[in-house]
Curated annotation (Swiss-Prot):
Record key words, sorted: Cytoplasm, Translation regulation
Keyword Cytoplasm: yes
Domain of life: Bacteria
Organism ancestry: Bacteria, Pseudomonadati, Pseudomonadota, Gammaproteobacteria, Oceanospirillales
Stated role: During stationary phase, converts 70S ribosomes to an inactive dimeric form (100S ribosomes).
InterPro entries hit by this protein: Ribosome_modulation_factor, RMF_sf
Protein name as it appears in the record: Ribosome modulation factor
BP-aspect Gene Ontology terms: regulation of translation
Any matching Pfam family: RMF
The family this protein is said to belong to: Belongs to the ribosome modulation factor family.
Any one GO CC term of the record: cytoplasm
Localization of this protein: Cytoplasm
Length: 69
């Protein structure tokens, strides 16, 4: 198997986190599915909070969900 099937909810969370860290609006959520949107928004909130706390670049690498998984 070349690559495992990834969890859609985890991917939505990670994409939301990245959007929050880069300062994108929460209205940029690409999903219309309520469950995926919920995970995306959770990631966005976490990323936005980390951005406001100054955890960007090297100082925030321990919080990056892609590094943890």
């Amino acid at each position: 198997m070349k690559r495992q099937k990834r969890d859609r909810f985890q991917r939505a969370y990670v994409h939301g986190y990245k959007a929050g860290m880069t300062g994108r609006s929460r209205d940029d959520c690409p999903s219309q599915d309520i469950n995926l949107r919920e995970y995306w928004m959770s990631g966005w909130r976490e990323g936005r909070g980390d951005q406001w706390a100054g955890m960007t670049g090297i100082s925030g690498i321990h919080k990056n969900p892609m590094v943890l998984s």
